[in-house]
Amino acid sequence: MGVLSRVDTPEDVRRLNVAELRELAEEIREFLVRKVAATGGHLGPNLGVVELTIALHRVFDSPADPLIFDTGHQAYVHKILTGRKDRFDDLRKQGGLSGYPSRAESPHDWVESSHASAALSYADGLAKAFALGGQDRHVVAVVGDGALTGGMCWEALNNIAAAPDRPVVVVVNDNGRSYAPTIGGLADRLTALRTQPAYEHALDAGKRLLKSIPRVGESAYSMVHAVKAGIKDAVSPQELFSDLGLKYVGPVDGHDVVAMESALRRAKDFGGPVVVHAVTQKGRGYEHAENHVADQMHACDPIDPLTGRPLGGAKARGWTSVFSEELIEHARRRSDIVAITAAMPGPTGLSAFGERFPDRMFDVGIAEQHAMASAAGLALGGMHPVVAIYSTFLNRAFDQLLMDVALLKQPVTVVLDRAGITGPDGASHNGMWDLSLLGIIPGIRVAAPRDAATLREELGEALAVTDGPTVLRFPKGSVAEDLTAVERIDGVDVLRAADPESAVRTQRGDVLIVAVGPFARIGLAAAELLAPEGVSVTVVDPRWVLPVSDTVVKLAENYRLVVTLEDSGLHGGIGSTVSARLRSVGLDVPTRDLGVPQQFLDHASRDQVLEQLGLTPTDVARRIAGWLDAR
């Protein structure tokens, strides 16, 4: 019987000897490869935090001592050690285990952490709350070195450092080796010494003694302090943290469970804010992840665990790759086109752009706010920036888009990948908020391509705009074959006419479906289901969904019912915008909006979520028929 089979709680982990801990780490890696290969998920990051997480659960008393994982996709090992290993067969599946910490799953999960750079702020607030309540509890935040490129981390660290007696332990999971490990007895000795409370008392006493010497005391103290600081900074990469007033332990080999536990115990015993710097290897212990050049299998679909290759053969062409190729074509012809990403060049399709135009590609780190304001500066300087981010991360850059780009009428194109329902990553990653946010920005123009052809077309149109921001949004996954319009009227594509024999501009019918982006396919399928019932339906794709086209308004006059269909939130979405526009011109035609309710939706596949929401062709046709009957 293996060690892992005997571990269901942190208490079980604390009972193990060193040999068993090392065996446990290897068994966990084998478990992760086997399970994530079957379901897909974040494999590389979790292979890199096995020993680190084991040590955390041996030193701290979770859940009394909160363990908060920044970018919570690195919490799989935490889930295994807190009684959830038997649920990994359903990881990221409907009704199954979340791919992120989940308060609904376990008291060991304090937050639903998934967006980067927030863990330290959670930790700061929790530590303050415990102090105010007189509770003697430690708070631990595990933050990846990538997340430290986000300014929010440093805002939090500044506040954490302001309370030297508040027990917050910040574990920097450095899996990119952006800090060089320090080797040698002097560094080890200084690390141990600096975090002993007796050392702090001695420092205070020495400081008082030196400063009390008449005339030379202050200078003597300054000289000794400078020598001490110089030695520390020469032997370990800590100045970023020590200059804030934070104690520093490390660098520590994050794959040596004994060393990791020892470092964490020293940090815990200190009793104040401490940074523990753990150097880890992403993808550790799985050859195909270690050798995966792009990102050490950061996230993967189901794979063959023996070869590391995706199951099911080659993937169909994706939206992201179409965007990537088209942007490069435009950039070849125009030297003013530059690209910006917030630490995600691969997932947003900008890696190839960066290889082709290295001087025109800017990865700003996990800093969407800065990305947008920097784009405004580039535009002011004569460039046309393209900011490519996930739709869900637009929330972070909204103020800059509103006040630094739109207010100044700067030509910045924002490309929102993973718009709409994304599925397995759950509530935090569904891109369902963007249209509600964008709809309140004066002068903004938003396109929603329905296929590869319209994505290429609309990207070109966006890059031609010189007097304000433009936005393109498209979903996750593969792009289906192109849908050809039967007619284009002033930029609006008619995909199906209620009466194919008469002019679309003047014909009358029962229903006008205004379908946004890929939902055009649902609209067309619903129209075909309604046709045998004698319901005449015209389906249009406005292409540019904001502002609402005059053509949509004119067409609406000729129908008994206008139905909008969108892969985004209903409140403030395209449906409500179309309805408001029709009312503003005094058009009294009934409207109905079909889209995503303003709810936090649990993880499941995209198709499962759409079925659950009644956004399938059958459901749409049934609801339209019911609305017509009610009239």
UniProtKB/Swiss-Prot annotation:
Superkingdom, according to UniProt?
Bacteria
This protein's cofactor list reads:
Mg(2+); thiamine diphosphate
Pathway entry: Metabolic intermediate biosynthesis; 1-deoxy-D-xylulose 5-phosphate biosynthesis; 1-deoxy-D-xylulose 5-phosphate from D-glyceraldehyde 3-phosphate and pyruvate: step 1/1
Q: Which SUPFAM superfamilies match?
A: Thiamin diphosphate-binding fold (THDP-binding), TK C-terminal domain-like
Q: Does the keyword Metal-binding apply?
A: yes
Taxonomic placement: Bacteria, Bacillati, Actinomycetota, Actinomycetes, Mycobacteriales
Q: Which Pfam families match?
A: DXP_synthase_N, Transket_pyr, Transketolase_C
Tell me which family the UniProt entry assigns to this protein: Belongs to the transketolase family. DXPS subfamily.
Matching entries from InterPro entries are given as:
Dxylulose-5-P_synthase, THDP-binding, Transketo_C/PFOR_II, Transketolase-like_Pyr-bd, Transketolase_BS, Transketolase_C
Q: Name one GO biological process term.
A: 1-deoxy-D-xylulose 5-phosphate biosynthetic process
| Molecular function terms, GO-annotated | 1-deoxy-D-xylulose-5-phosphate synthase activity; magnesium ion binding; thiamine pyrophosphate binding
Report the co-factor binding details.
Answer: Binds 1 Mg(2+) ion per subunit. Binds 1 thiamine pyrophosphate per subunit.
| This protein's UniProt keywords | Isoprene biosynthesis, Magnesium, Metal-binding, Thiamine biosynthesis, Thiamine pyrophosphate, Transferase
**What's the protein name?**
1-deoxy-D-xylulose-5-phosphate synthase
Q: What does the entry list as the binding residues for Mg(2+)?
A: 145, 175
Which catalysed reactions does the entry list for this protein? D-glyceraldehyde 3-phosphate + pyruvate + H(+) = 1-deoxy-D-xylulose 5-phosphate + CO2
Binding-site residues, thiamine diphosphate: 73, 114-116, 146-147, 175, 286, 368
Q: Which organism is it from?
A: Nocardia farcinica (strain IFM 10152)
- Primary role: Catalyzes the acyloin condensation reaction between C atoms 2 and 3 of pyruvate and glyceraldehyde 3-phosphate to yield 1-deoxy-D-xylulose-5-phosphate (DXP).
Extract one GO cellular component term from the record.
Answer: cytosol
Q: Which top EC class applies here?
A: transferase
EC number, UniProt record: 2.2.1.7
Relate the assembly described in the record: Homodimer.
